[in-house]
Amino acid sequence: MIQSAVARNYDTIAIPMMGTGATDMLVSGMPGVLGWWSPDPRGIIPLDGLRVTRSLRQSSKKFEVRIDTCFEQVMRGCGDPARADGWITSDFIEAYLHMHDLGWAHSIEVFDRAGSLAGGLYGVRIGGFFAGESMFHRQRDASKVALVALVDVMRDSGMQLLDTQWCTEHLASLGAVEIHRSEYLRRLKGALDGAARP
């Protein structure tokens, strides 16, 4: 487990590490061991390359999008113990709640018309860079609607790099691509050095 003192100071480790292109994740089969990874190739979603189908546009009309109103609930949705290969533990949630309190970690939440949390995503923002950590849905298309909203917010605020870490088949269907680590690090430097609006 990430010890409580470490969880409270996790931002002092995570933010500098993310600035080098590393990403954190608990190591499978080794409870409590946190690893830092720098995948090569690296998955990103170009902000002008998100694929939004007509059916997704229609689906989005059924939802309301909010930002940073229920960060913990989004993390718990992403960390649902019923999900296969779950890696988001209560200690991990505590660490990210601290980073949220400090203004580093953010969530995009999607609510249905009844006011229930239908899905969302969370990640870490540093300047013009956003590291998408995880997303979930309880209703069809809700996580995709959150991703569309994130890309819109990033474009509107002048952000430059949406890091997905790995390029899964699901993310590729939404426009994620793989780039070599050297290209990723070049883009990361530009995003960290660039001026993005809050």
Label for each model-derived stretch:
Residues 1-198:
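N-acyltransferase acceptor-side catalytic subdomain
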